[in-house]
Structure formats: structure tokens, C-alpha cells
Amino acid sequence: SKYCVMNSKGDIIRGKPARDFVFYSRSGYSSTYYKDWIPDLKETQAYAAERGAHVIGSAGAKDINGWKDICRTIEDCGLPMVELNFGCPHPAMMPGVHGGSMIGQEPEVAYEVTRQVCESVDIPVIVKLTPDQSKPLAIAKAVREAGAAGVTAINRHTGFVVDIDTGQPRIGGPAGIGGTWVKPLSLRWVHRIHEELGMPISGSNGIFDHRDVIEFIMAGATIVQVGSILMVKGIKWLPKIIEGVEAFMDEKGYASVDEMVGLASRRSVKDYSEQFSRNRVHAVVNPDTCKNPTCNICIQVCFYEALSQNPEGSIDVHTDNCIGCELCLDVCPFDSIEMKETAPAQFDQGFFNIPEGIFEHDKFGTRRNNMDTIRANSPKFNKEPAE
């Protein structure tokens, strides 16, 4: 194995990792035969059971017999659940190996491996998904149909990092990459799977502290996995995460984790037509706290020409251009901007509004980007045959 922990600039950290750390790593073939783990698994499971905890086994193999044998061994050791790792990015770099994320990119293979494992054991089976594909939802559907009790969303991406001072790739070449920066990407799939399939989810990839754990839960995860941050900060970081979650629940009045599961996912819009049909807002600038012209960052970042400086040096808001995107609100360092709801009467006064009918279905359905409509509307495919 090779590990490389970097800051957001790509430099190796020297000391405690910041919240935006990047964890770049590569693991090779296991040097330990899986049956050599049996004493440790039994001891760990007994220790956990005495303390009301659970141990979930993790399996990866090069052929179907290996998958079944390892999972049966995990069950025989008394573990209550096993995870099939269809997300590991490393097998793609191992000559002659077809496993990990390679299986996780093929719905048919993922289905069959999951089906045979589920038939071989009596404990619940979950599947760890890979982000190195365009359709994790399809894999989640396939493994659910094959008998999986849930999925883990989501494993590490495959990356490539360069040391520009030496011109060399970090740790030799492509490797798995994760860290808190990837959390929004992970949360996307947690949300989608929760929304579309409603199946149990173990959230993973992007956790630093308790606030990240809570985000995963509110996106739809029923449990979470914490790995990279424990490797760089030590196992003693885990109790701090748990304590933080408990303190947050007490502060906000949540009686159980179940009350938080999928909370944000259920409140999410389904598509952009719903997003823009909600109440319109516009920016309002407080001249008493605004520091323009010393600071005019809001004017600089507004792509819609909705803000300008008037002759007196204060900020004018052009409500006919302000679409309510809130970028000025986010970048203002003096908290001088707020967004106010646009009243219906203000639209008649020229305040910006979404043009009527813009999201009508036929506007998007007339020419879809598929081969049938492309061919139908392309002169190349519609030439009369030569006589």
C-alpha cells in the first residue's frame, strides 16, 4: 500500500490535516489469506456483541467461488452482515484481476455475484457501489433485485495526482482518492438512491466530523462509514464524532436518528421546473453596513448586471435583472445583503420573473437527444436515395 495525504493545494500535509484534506492511496494484493483472519473476526465480533455494537464483514474476490467462500466464512465467524465490495478502485490496476469497481460498473455481473452470495449465506448482504461510472442507480437496482438488503454509497473515485516540482505522479500513478471535498458527490447518490429506491443505505466517502455524518443521514443514509479521517487523525477521533452527533440531536430536539434519515432528501425539489416555480426572491442591500466602494465584490460577481454603483457610492439593485441566485449574499463579507420575497404585485412593476410557459413539456419534448430524433432532424440521414 501507498498513502499520500495532501492539502487543497496538493502539497503533502505536515502535521494535523485540515478539513479539506485529500487522501490519495493505493492498495495491492492482500498478503494475508482470508482464513487467517478467522481468530481475529471471532474475537472482534465477541467484543462488539458484549458492548452492543455490530461488526460488518467486507468481501472481495477474484471469482464467484471466492466471493461465496469468504462470505460463508464471515457468517461462520458470527458476523451479522457482509458487504460485497463492488466499489474498490484498485483491481482495475491489477493485471488479470476483474473485481471491485470493475464489477460495480456491470449491472449483469453485479446482479449475478450478489444473487449467488445471497443464496449462499443467511445473513444480510449489502453492496458497496463505485462512483467510477455514470449510473450507480442502475447497479443499486440490480443488486436489490438479486437480494441485497442495502447498498453503501459510495466508494472512492480513481484519481491521478501530479507533483509539479518533480514532474512525477504521486505514489507512482493512478490511485483511489477521497476526502471531505468529495462529500457533495457522495451525497448526490445517497439522495438519489433514497429517493428512487427507498432501500437502506450506508453513507460513505467525505466524512470529517459529526456534521458530515448528519448530512449523510439527512440525505438518506441509515448508517455511515468512517475510514480516511480515522487513518489520518487516529481512532480516538471516532468517539468525538459520536459525541458530536448526540450533542446535535439534543440541541435540535431529535429523539432518534430515524427522525433525521432522509429529512433533506424528502424536502428536495424533483427537477428544475419545481425549483423555479417556487417563490421568487430579489436582493436588498443595507447601505448602513455596506462598505462599497472599498468593497464591491457583489458587483464583480453578479453575472446578471443586477448590481451597480450609483453616483453617491452606494449599491443599486436592478430588480428587473436580479434573478435571486443569492451569489451576492454568499460573497458579501459584511452581511449587508438579504434576499426578500418578490410579491406578486412587484412583477407588474418590472421585477424579474420566469417567463410564462418556459417549463411546458412540449418545449423539451420536441427534439430529444437520442438517435431517433437526431436522425429524423438531420439532413445527413434524410437524403433521398440516389436513383
Indicate where each model-derived feature is located.
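Short secondary-structure boundary segments
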Residues: 1-3, 86, 155, 228-229
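Extended, hydrophobic interaction surfaces within ordered domains
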Residues: 192-197, 212-268, 317, 323, ...
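C-terminal accessory/binding modules appended to enzymatic or scaffolding proteins
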Residues: 279-312, 316
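Alpha/beta enzyme core
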Residues: 50, 62-202, 208-223, 270-274, ...
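C-terminal helical cap(s) of enzyme catalytic domains, especially alpha/beta-barrels
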Residues: 6-19, 162-178, 229-254, 348-358
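Short beta->alpha connector loops at strand-helix junctions that form conserved
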Residues: 1, 205, 227-228, 340
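N-terminal capping/small domains of soluble enzymes
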Residues: 1-72, 384-386
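Flanking helices and flexible, charged tails adjoining ferredoxin-like Fe-S electron-transfer domains
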Residues: 247-255, 259-278, 287-288, 297-299, ...
